[in-house]
Amino acid sequence: MGKLYVFDHPLIQHKITYIRDKNTGTKDFRELVDEVASLMAFEITRDLPLEDIEIETPVSKATTKVIAGKKLGLIPILRAGLGMVDGILKLIPAAKVGHVGLYRDPKTLQPVEYYVKLPTDVEERDFIVLDPMLATGGSAAEAINSLKKRGAKQIKLMCIVAAPEGVKVVQEEHPDVDIYVAALDEKLNDHGYVVPGLGDAGDRLFGTK
């Protein structure tokens, strides 16, 4: 079973308060999501391998460490996942960015893939799937399916707020995928929204309804 990591860092929790607040405007909401994604990236990349290299400082020669050639790919689920990309790219500018677009079939209520664009070297990369909200878990599970069908081997899921129901779905369908969240909320309501949640992340990021 994949592990669930819930970040309790004070800076993250402070910023999530304002992400949740319905009075936070689009500009501030967008900046806060960006900042939380950056903070979460520190933890989600903790297991990146390092190797020694020789450099010369202004004072002397030194042996120091760099990331050992690990190739990373960021996969935002359209459209809300886009809000998390830049915050991570600030720390990992060499990461490639793919996209997965899904819509919900009105009859079956199941997610349907309508767009996928990935780096060409899928099998060589570790991927981080990005979505601010993990609600029912259907979209995240289908996005992970899309990656696996195209050869991805190492996948993590990174969300800002998650419902227990969504976590359960992803863990059952993808027991090899670890989930990283900034907050684990109480439940889903009858409309499929996370409670207390943060509303519709896509609308709040892009100022739409």
Curated annotation (Swiss-Prot):
Gene that specifies this protein: upp
NCBIfam families referenced in this protein's UniProt entry, alphabetically: PRK00129.1, upp
HAMAP family (UniProt xref): Upp_B (MF_01218_B)
Pathway entry: Pyrimidine metabolism; UMP biosynthesis via salvage pathway; UMP from uracil: step 1/1
Cofactor(s) it depends on: Mg(2+)
Family: Belongs to the UPRTase family.
Reactions mediated catalytically: UMP + diphosphate = 5-phospho-alpha-D-ribose 1-diphosphate + uracil
Example GO BP: uracil salvage
Protein name per Swiss-Prot or TrEMBL: Uracil phosphoribosyltransferase
Regulation: Allosterically activated by GTP.
Keyword Transferase belongs to the record: yes
Native organism: Bacillus thuringiensis (strain Al Hakam)
Leader sequence segment: none
Matching CDD domains: PRTases_typeI (cd06223)
Enzyme's top EC category: transferase
Binding site for uracil: V194, G199, D200, A201
Disulfide bonds: none
EC number: 2.4.2.9
Record carries keyword Nucleotide-binding: yes
